[in-house]
């Protein structure tokens, strides 16, 4: 993936769209198509270099749902990298989103950054895990890369997000995952979907990020899903040439400059 190594890399993270074959279908009382459409003006205004889809793109894994999401994101006019969530069918999803971890971790170089997408899903399960083979492939991709910094994306949270309703469905082998992460000091950011609310934490020199949903979000730190009246959102990231990570959220009526951001060096 081409990018000017002297400029920051602007990424728009879109997650947990839960679109169904029926465009009028409701998800937790919200219209998934309509709420994603509401975010498009803010997405265009952010002017990203690429879009990163972090799973649960579809609610029913239907071809029609992936078609509509792909059509909407095509209006942003940049490449789309995508990984599946527990609601997705990878075989169906990759027909519209070919750039993803469909045959093992997917690595793309953009400027000084290596972006690695990993599939944490297990067929028929809500929780996730990584096979040893996938983790070894991840090691190999980092060894083969001359990038200065690394971002890793997955669907399931590798750390608790303090929301019991979703923490029971987390990544089941986080210890193995972080063992491989800790082998390479170039890893600066790990980001995921699944949790349906904003999350930020720092672990050593790595920023850990949970993304909100484009359809319905929960108030954080709740025992059960509790609809957040703030509405749908997506995450923006700016990955600096110095390894810094700036990030914040975009909502339907908010501009990137108007959002609170975090930075790690």
Q: What are the roles of these predicted feature ranges?
A:
Residues 1-68, 161:
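N-terminal active-site segment of His-dependent metallophosphoesterases
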Residues 23-24, 53-74, 89-102, 128, ...:
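Metal-dependent catalytic neighborhoods of phosphoester/phosphodiester hydrolases
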Residues 180, 202-265:
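Binuclear metal-dependent phosphoesterase catalytic core
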Residues 64-79, 169-178, 205-214, 263-265:
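Short, electropositive alpha-helical surface patch
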Residues 39-50, 127-207, 243-245, 261-264:
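His/acidic metal-ligating clusters that form di-metal
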Residues 8-22, 112-122, 151-153, 206-212, ...:
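Active-site-proximal beta-strand elements of phosphoester/diester hydrolases
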Residues 12-34, 59, 90-102, 123-132, ...:
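Acidic/histidine-rich helix-loop elements
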Residues 13-15, 50-56, 80-86, 119, ...:
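Active-site neighborhood of phospho(di)ester-bond hydrolases with catalytic His/Asp-centered motifs
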């Amino acid at each position: 993936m081409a990018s000017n190594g002297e400029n920051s890399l602007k990424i728009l993270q879109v997650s947990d769209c839960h679109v169904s074959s029926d465009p009028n279908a409701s998800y937790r009382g919200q219209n998934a198509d309509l709420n994603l459409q509401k975010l498009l003006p803010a997405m265009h205004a952010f002017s990203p270099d690429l879009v990163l889809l972090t799973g649960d793109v579809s609610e029913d894994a239907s071809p029609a749902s992936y078609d509509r999401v792909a059509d909407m994101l095509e209006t942003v006019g940049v490449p789309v990298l995508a990984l599946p969530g527990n609601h997705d069918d990878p075989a169906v999803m990759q027909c519209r989103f070919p750039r993803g971890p469909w045959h093992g971790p997917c690595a793309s170089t953009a400027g000084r950054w290596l972006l690695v997408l990993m599939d944490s899903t297990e067929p028929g399960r809500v929780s996730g895990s990584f096979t040893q083979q996938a983790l070894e492939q991840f090691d190999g991709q980092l060894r083969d890369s001359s990038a200065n910094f690394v971002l890793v994306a997955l669907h399931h949270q590798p750390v608790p997000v303090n929301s019991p309703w979703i923490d029971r469905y987390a990544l089941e082998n986080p210890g193995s995952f972080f063992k491989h992460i800790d082998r390479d000091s170039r890893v600066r950011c790990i980001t995921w979907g699944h949790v349906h609310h904003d999350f930020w934490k720092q672990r050593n020199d790595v920023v850990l990020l949970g993304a909100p949903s484009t359809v319905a979000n929960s108030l954080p730190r709740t025992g059960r899903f509790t609809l957040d009246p703030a509405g749908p959102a997506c995450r923006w990231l700016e990955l600096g040439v110095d390894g810094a990570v700036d990030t914040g959220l975009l909502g339907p009526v908010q501009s990137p400059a108007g959002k609170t951001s975090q930075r790690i060096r």
